[in-house]
Amino acid sequence: MSKFDKHKEYKLTLPRKYYEKKGLSGIQNLGNTCYVNSIIQCLSNTLKLTDYLLTNGYKKDDPREINKTKNNFNITLSYIFVLKKLWEHNNVIQPLSFINKLKNIKQVTNEQQDAHEFLLFMLNNLNENLSYPININFSDKLTNIQKDITLKFYNMNKKDYSIIKENFNIMFLINIKCKQCNNEDFMYEQSYDISLSINKSHLLDELLDEYFKEEYIEDKKCDKCNFKGCIKKIYLWNLPKYIIIHLQKFDNNGRKINKHIYYSNSKINYLKYFSPNREARHNYFYDLYSVICHQGNANNGHYYNISKNLNNKI
């Protein structure tokens, strides 16, 4: 997980010294819960989110506080309790209540689970229970196509926006262009992560180039001229403060791809992946601050987390 370098100076409610000295607690495994523990540690070191939850920031955004009419609202409440324990003292905690609530909805079983899937579950759960409606005002400087695309994304998020979407939601603009008549269609997608196949390179920047490169679709028919053959290209439309990069470490048969992927903070500028219709105002470099690691295979393995605190110590 990486954070945008423009936000190195955190605007936190709690004193910076609080985050420099605390949050070094461990989490005891309670059965096959290492995937849960690693995600908790990763999210705990996402300080914009942690500060928001520790200081009850959700009460300021929405007077309803946590929406208890939503599904699994008790998971969110229990996670906040775990978070407070993690940042109370630097020791080992046992998140028994949180794990039991996850067991009740089959998110924790007697078998090994996938950390990436659990991360998405947690982000969706937190977003659902911390969400509030939003409005939008268009700038006079936007072009018609920019207004149209912005409106599409607004309609996708206007009823359930939260600090989760503010900090993690990636917006993609997918361009489909006919090779014959150059007619263009657009699709709009959003995600909490960029999921990369790691087959073609061991360098993260090359894997990203592969993900965002043009793709020829032979059997796609143009809506305008009926010609078969289009070019598909994925663009970024908006990037959040934090980017989650998911490396697909298992193939379609469940076999683990034992391959190291190398990352360079100073090398990747995500600006080059933005849509030409989007006028990005600055470069997009991100600092790596947290990694979920896996040892073993799909059936018998162990997850653990490596994170940096505000002192850049692991």
Model segments located where?
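Beta-sheet entry/capping signal
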Residues: 33, 175-177, 242, 304
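Exposed substrate/partner-binding surface patches
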Residues: 1-22, 43, 56-70, 86, ...
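Processing junctions and N-termini across compartments
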Residues: 28, 172-175, 215-219
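USP/UBP deubiquitinase core
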Residues: 2-143, 242-247
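Internal, well-ordered alpha-helical segments in soluble enzyme and binding-protein domains
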Residues: 118, 160, 174-177, 221
